[in-house]
């Protein structure tokens, strides 16, 4: 059995996921850098350091997920932390198009169903598929943690408020996929509470990453802060919560 705690971060070859991997290694973890493209994952793992291992993982591909779980089982025997970070914001946004411009093309009245399905395939169904595959490994740990990287734009409470600044970009694609992810977080937390596995959702804030064409206002170090905190929760920590680094967020 591997001595160090083991973490898997999906979508960890760049952005917030890469920073989460770096931070968890700094806390003594062996980190599996999940990446659809193995070559990019290997390059990212080199950045993280000797305690990082690249792992080919496409969250929309059941065969890839199963192979990743089997490799972890054979090489490490368990999983202490799962960070479901992999996400896409769209499939059709043109280079240089602002978030606001894209939002106008993805209203409930005009959005392509193929676009919605593609975003949800990664952001919702991918999270469920990976979590299901990794649960046997998480159950082998003494106090496993699952962190779902969500977004405040998925908050129904906020979007129901006419004064909410980002209300205009709420739509069936990315934003609603994060609403669904929040619901899944609660469902997972309810089921797993008797096992001691804690499941929480983290909002990294508007972080400068490829997801938003690097238009965000926060650094990846700031964006990774809350997911890492939740990954390191002590035994008495909460489960079934939604928060950012300023505190709890409304569902």
Residue ranges and their predicted role:
Residues 83, 130-134, 138, 184-185, ...:
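Hydrophobic positions on the long internal alpha-helix
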Residues 9-10, 84-85, 145-151, 198-203:
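Structural signature of the Rossmann-like NAD(P)-dependent dehydrogenase/reductase core
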Residues 38, 56-70:
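The beta1-alpha1 cofactor-binding region of Rossmann-like NAD(H)/NADP(H)-dependent oxidoreductases
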Residues 88-120, 139-194:
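Catalytic loop of short-chain dehydrogenase/reductase
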Residues 1-32:
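Canonical Rossmann dinucleotide-binding motif of NAD(H)/NADP(H)-dependent dehydrogenases/reductases
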Residues 27-43:
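Conserved glycine-rich Rossmann-like NAD(P)H-binding loop of the short-chain dehydrogenase/reductase
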Residues 179, 194, 201-202, 209, ...:
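C-terminal helical subdomain
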């Amino acid at each position: 059995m591997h001595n160090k705690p083991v973490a898997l971060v999906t979508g960890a070859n760049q952005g917030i996921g890469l920073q989460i991997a770096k931070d968890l290694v700094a806390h003594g973890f062996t980190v599996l850098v999940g990446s659809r493209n193995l070559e990019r994952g290997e390059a990212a793992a080199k950045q993280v350091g000797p305690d990082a291992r690249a792992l080919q993982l496409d969250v929309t591909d059941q065969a890839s997920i199963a192979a990743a779980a089997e490799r972890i089982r054979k090489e490490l025997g368990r999983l202490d932390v799962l960070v479901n970070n992999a996400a896409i914001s769209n499939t059709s946004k043109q280079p240089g198009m602002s978030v606001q411009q894209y939002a106008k093309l993805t209203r409930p009245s005009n959005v392509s169903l193929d676009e919605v399905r593609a975003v949800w395939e990664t952001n919702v169904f991918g999270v469920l598929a990976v979590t299901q595959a990794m649960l046997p490994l998480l159950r082998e740990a003494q106090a496993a943690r699952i962190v779902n990287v969500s977004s405040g734009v998925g908050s129904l409470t906020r979007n129901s408020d006419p004064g909410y600044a980002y209300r205009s970009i709420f739509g069936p694609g990315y934003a609603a996929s994060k609403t669904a992810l929040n619901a899944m977080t609660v469902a997972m937390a309810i089921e797993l509470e008797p096992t001691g596995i804690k499941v929480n959702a983290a909002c990294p804030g508007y972080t400068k990453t490829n997801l938003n064409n690097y238009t965000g206002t926060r650094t990846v170090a700031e964006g990774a802060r809350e997911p890492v905190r939740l990954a390191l929760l002590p035994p008495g920590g909460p489960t079934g919560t939604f928060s950012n680094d300023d505190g709890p967020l409304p569902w």
